[in-house]
Structures are given as structure tokens and as C-alpha cells.
Amino acid sequence: MIIVTGGAGFIGSNIVKALNDKGITDILVVDNLKDGTKFVNLVDLDIADYMDKEDFLIQIMAGEEFGDVEAIFHEGACSSTTEWDGKYMMDNNYQYSKELLHYCLEREIPLLYASSAATYGGRTSDFIESREYEKPLNVYGYSKFLFDEYVRQILPEANSQIVGFRYFNVYGPREGHKGSMASVAFHLNTQLNNGESPKLFEGSENFKRDFVYVGDVADVNLWFLENGVSGIFNLGTGRAESFQAVADATLAYHKKGQIEYIPFPDKLKGRYQAFTQADLTNLRAAGYDKPFKTVAEGVTEYMAWLNRDA
């Protein structure tokens, strides 16, 4: 069996899909379906069982077994970069992850977990997986950074695989439940389909991020499971592209629309990553050599998926 925490969420459900595509259906999805809209991410997927995250954590802490577990993909977390309840964030992202890590280490179960580019904070260059480059801007980034630091202490002694992926700006199918935290491509598509003007912040040609397609993210996760490599790795494309490029690809697909530029909100000033670009040196050195989709390629594929029933 393979366990996917956050399996009804954005990246987790795409990992479930990638496993299904390889003929793997003996999957336990762990999630919190308090937000009932997330169920749609699993409707077209095949899993063996579902468990609430609180029940799962109780069983993990009690040392209970789940049968023959081949691996755990740990994607479950609070991923809101605007959530400032530090206790909630640390319980959800840090303590939970530590419990799961020790459970896996005791049983030599591979653990592949979600870290984040938020660990780098506001820097504009040198996104390198090393302590001197890490300075998170928010408590979400800090919770991810602290778990990475914890893993670094344990890695030299670990007898089983531990791998963390610092996700950059992931976009693609199955993110609709994320609301305001969904990608720009998702929001632009919704605005166009609602007959509204698609909106970007003023200066969006200058805001550049490493936008990585979720299908590529799932591919990397499965490659690492198959190859057993441990460590903490950036997971982006290695290319920074502008929000304007995302809008251009969206409009090109729809063949209509004109961008309306809106003022940059005060509440985000100083807390907003203006530039991200993954350094892929370590990922490539680990042996992962597949190309990543460009924004034009990924957004076009995503638009076709979003509008498949149109």
C-alpha cells in the first residue's frame, strides 16, 4: 500500500493520479474533508481507502500498522501563506510531520514530503538548498523550513529514504478548491468564463516566478520513489517567467479578453515574493533529467483540462 496525506488536495490528488496511471490503486488517502468541495479531486481516481487526518495521526502516534506500506507521500499541510496562527501552523505542518517521520524511520518506510520555496523568503537570487539562503517571510515558510532543518539532522543516520521537495509556484488540474490560493492561471480562466476582464496586479511583467506544472511535480515524486534518492531538493523548472506570460498563454487559449491591471494591495507589500527561480543543480545531480513544461506549454494543457466540458 502507498499512503498519500493531503491526497484529496491539489498536489496529493495529482500524485494519486500519477500512481493510477502506473496501475497502482492500493492507495490510502489521508485528508481533512471539512472542506467538502475537495472530494471532486478524487472522483475520477481509484483508491483503496480514505482516512481522516486526525484519526490517522492518532494511529501513527499509537504505533499502529497499516499493513505493508511501500511509501508515504506527505502532502498534507496548511498551505496558506496568509495564515498567521502560528500554533495552528506549527501543529499542522511541523509536529505532524515529525510524528510521521519517526513512524517511517522505525519501519524503514520511504517518506517523500512537501517542503516549499517559501523557505527562501524574499530573496531574488540563489535559491539554493542550503541554510545560508533560507529566511522565510511568513509562519508557513518557517514551519516548512524548521522541518527541513529537522530532517537535515536525521538524514546522515537514516536507514530509509527521506526526501523533501521545495515546491515553487505549482499550477494545474485539481486546485479549484484552494480559493484565493489557487494559481493565477486558474483565476484568469474563471474570470474569462464569467465574462469578466481578466485581472493582474500592475507591474505584473516585472513579477517573475518559477511556475511549475503539477504533472511534472507528480513525475518527480514518482521518480524519486523508484530511485530511492534522499535529500532536500528544489522542485521548479529552473526558469522564472512573468505573471504576464501566464496571462498571455491564457488569453491565447481563449482567443479573447484584455487584461485589466489593478493596484498592488498594501497588505501584501513586503510579504510578497517578487521573483523565484529554482536552482536545479542538486535535482539534476540526483539523476532527474526530464525537461519541465514552459508556462506556454503547461498553461495550454491546463486550459484544455479546465475547459474540457465547455
Curated annotation (Swiss-Prot):
Per the record, the pathway is: Nucleotide-sugar biosynthesis; ADP-L-glycero-beta-D-manno-heptose biosynthesis; ADP-L-glycero-beta-D-manno-heptose from D-glycero-beta-D-manno-heptose 7-phosphate: step 4/4
- Cofactor(s) for this UniProt protein: NADP(+)
Q: Which GO terms describe its molecular function?
A: ADP-glyceromanno-heptose 6-epimerase activity; NADP binding
Out of the domains of life, which is the source?
A: Bacteria
Q: Which reaction does it catalyse?
A: ADP-D-glycero-beta-D-manno-heptose = ADP-L-glycero-beta-D-manno-heptose
User: Which residues does the annotation say bind NADP(+)?
Assistant: 10-11, 31-32, 38, 53, 75-79, 92, 144, 170, 178
User: Could you say which enzyme class this protein belongs to?
Assistant: isomerase
**Which residues does this entry mark as bearing N6-acetyllysine?**
267
Q: Which UniProt keywords apply?
A: Acetylation, Carbohydrate metabolism, Isomerase, NADP
- What GO biological process, any one, is recorded here? carbohydrate metabolic process
The record's remark on the cofactor is: Binds 1 NADP(+) per subunit.
The residues that the entry says bind substrate are 169, 180, 187, 201-204, 209, 272
Question: Which Enzyme Commission number(s) are on file for it?
Answer: 5.1.3.20
This protein's assembly is summarised as:
Homopentamer.
Q: HAMAP family from the entry?
A: Heptose_epimerase
Its name, as the record gives it, is ADP-L-glycero-D-manno-heptose-6-epimerase
Q: From which source organism is this entry? A: Escherichia coli (strain SMS-3-5 / SECEC)
Q: What is this protein's gene name? A: hldD
